[in-house]
Regions:
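N-terminal secretory signal peptides
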Residues: 1-8, 12, 19-27
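Structured, non-membrane catalytic/scaffold regions adjacent to prosthetic-group chemistry
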Residues: 32-257
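Generic, well-ordered alpha-helical scaffold segments in large soluble proteins
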Residues: 16, 20, 150-153
Length: 257
């Protein structure tokens, strides 16, 4: 198993390898870090990091799966633990009976699916390890609808390149959102989970749906998913870096492990 303590150094190594001797190892320098041009170069390096990850790793490889006896007795809930908007509170009160997942954007057949409809579709159950960027990990069991199945049903456009997840929670001005490319969107372990450890997904863990993209770090596993949007360009969303934490604190967009 990959020790969570070596995840970030491995990814930083890949970034360094991709950008060669360009001097980006000086990223810790405050003067450079405040430079817009330097930050632009860093973002270019991140794109190369993503390419390096894809070349080195088998893009279809599965994340390790575990037995029930290996499940963590406590699975920490972090980030938003609830959502206080009137709409979400009403959905919780009626157990999401009137809630609908919207799937739109670059698709030919936009969908609006109830939780009952999602649960009636073919599902996948997996026991996997959640690795948080903060340094902790936990093993849990998830069941949900494969994202690839939903995208196929919606008629994904051949021009689409990314999938954006719009969430009910927010931190400050902007709502939480995340995104993945189509390789991860169609990975067999990428699901929209509606069950955790054999029980209905709890609010604190992102009810009604939580993205599970098992080969990426925890901040990519968006909670409270309300809408799935197919797009050809991440630059049109908020600050343009493909996710809330990517926009706010320059987390890597591709958080592969």
């Amino acid at each position: 198993m990959t020790d969570s303590k070596i995840i970030m150094p491995r990814r930083r190594f890949l970034t360094g390898a991709a950008i060669g001797g360009s001097g980006l190892m000086l990223a810790g320098c405050d003067m450079l870090n405040e430079s817009d041009s330097f930050r632009s170069v860093l973002r270019s390096g991140e794109a190369l990091n993503k390419t390096a990850q894809r070349i080195i790793g088998d893009r279809a490889a599965l994340a390790p799966e575990f037995s029930e006896s290996e499940m963590s007795p406590v699975f920490k809930a972090n980030g938003s633990l609830s959502v206080s908007t009137p709409e979400y509170v009403a959905h919780v009160a009626d157990s999401f009976a009137d809630w609908r997942l919207k799937i739109d954007g670059m698709v030919t057949k936009p969908l609006a699916l109830s939780l009952t409809q999602l649960k009636a579709m073919p599902s996948r159950e997996q026991i996997t390890r959640h690795d948080c960027v903060e340094g902790w990990s936990a093993i849990g069991k998830w069941r949900g609808t494969p994202l690839g199945l939903l995208l196929k049903q919606a008629g994904l456009s051949t021009k689409a390149r990314y999938v954006v997840f719009h969430c009910a929670d927010s931190f400050g001005a902007n709502p939480y959102y995340e995104s993945v490319d189509l390789i991860d969107a169609f990975h067999p372990q990428t699901i929209l989970a509606w069950q955790m450890n054999g029980q209905t997904l709890p609010v604190k863990h992102g009810a009604p749906l939580r993205l599970r993209v098992e080969r990426q770090l925890g901040y990519k596993h968006a909670k409270y998913v309300m809408r799935v949007e197919a797009t050809d360009d991440l630059g049109k969303f908020y600050e343009g870096k493909g996710g809330y934490w990517e926009d706010q604190v320059d987390y890597d967009w591709y958080a592969g492990i």
